[in-house]
Amino acid sequence: MSNFNFDFAENDFGPLAAKMRPTSLEQYFGQSHLIGEGKPLRKAIQAGHIYSMIFWGPPGTGKTTLAEIIAQRINAEVERISAVTSGIKEIREAIDRAKQNRLADRKTILFVDEVHRFNKSQQDAFLPHIEDGTVIFIGATTENPSFELNNALLSRARVYVLKSLTTAEIEQVLQQAVEDPKRGLGKERLILEENLLQVLAEYVNGDARLALNCLELMVDMADETENGKKIDRTLLKEVLGERQARFDKQGDRFYDLISALHKSVRGSAPDAALYWYARILTAGGDPLYVARRLLAIASEDVGNADPRAMQVALAAWDCFSRVGAYEGERAIAQAIIYLSVAPKSNAVYTAFNTAKQQAKDLPDYDVPPHLRNAPTNLMKELGYGTEYRYAHDEPNAYAAGENYFPPELKDTQYYFPTNRGMEIQIKEKLERLREQDKSAVKKRYK
């Protein structure tokens, strides 16, 4: 068994972050949106009704700790697998132990750290054992599960998003570590400069583990004086080095930057869009994530006002893949500028959403006979394809008066092109075709 509940409180050699690891929900800092009083996950943990789940969040937000607390709460055996160092062999061994636990009427939590690093076949290896209840699967990932995990695995697990801890929460974690005489630094004679813990908490961007590691390093490096160990900002700067960008790929700051980029492009502000793109890159963001977002923008915010926008966005993505980051980042910048100055239309976005909603809400109307496929004589005898008008045989390849909706929806219109860009011509053409329909002698529906 690969149980990961170690009592570092009794081990002077354990790292501070491990010693201070919470063992109950009451000791746990952060994630009040998930485990605050009355929240569904907290109720499930307290009731012992645990199901498979994925914890998605930045480093140091308590994913592993929460899994440990859950395991302790339901008195389950824990099999821990790291996707960085494990493969199919380790997965099979863990499953075999879980099967033995099941024979002994013991639950097993299979905790998979960095689960996004497993490939499709490795992820698939968990499915039958989740399905038959051999294990309760808990995966931890710093990457977006929608992109990194198989749909089959996602459908069998509830995804919970863990947020970066706030500065105040990190400061509480640090204060507890300073004061706790058993697990923390309470026995040390520390002389802390005023507001030092707050400065450290602001630096680590919501990563509690990093905060505790930095605190421990400062204590180790501090000189012993007559009154104790003095820890000031000079020592803090020495430990921290150059301040890093306040950025977290999976946290709110990341999505705030992406949102700012998207809104700048939508608002036809190329300079602002370039600024936010540069901020994302400087902070370590993935340029290909931006490239994917540009494809969505090309469809959602430009649409048929400039159909070339999609081609430009796709070409930028392709360029990045072919030439690498240095040149590829500039190609993405070019696409950002193009999309920013392109005429804007959300007519496609609105039309598609309306069509999807009606398809969901309205009855499943039959396909009219003239639109049905008729590959066999029987189908032809049943009237399939009867009176279908082949557009290419009609004047200007348009069957005036024909209708391709069920009769119940004959006058429906989803797509309303704007008066911008290419949609000006599209709108004019559709208006001409509708006038032909109105004046047509041969109409499908009266």
UniProtKB/Swiss-Prot annotation:
The keyword Nucleotide-binding applies. ATP binds at G57, P58, P59, G60, T61, G62, K63, T64. The keyword tRNA processing does not apply. One of its GO terms (molecular function) is ATP hydrolysis activity. InterPro entries: AAA+_ATPase, AAA_assoc_2, AAA_ATPase_RarA/MGS1/WRNIP1, ATPase_AAA_core, DNA_pol3_clamp-load_cplx_C, MgsA_C, P-loop_NTPase. DNA-dependent ATPase that plays important roles in cellular responses to stalled DNA replication processes. Belongs to the AAA ATPase family. RarA/MGS1/WRNIP1 subfamily. This is Replication-associated recombination protein A. The gene is rarA.
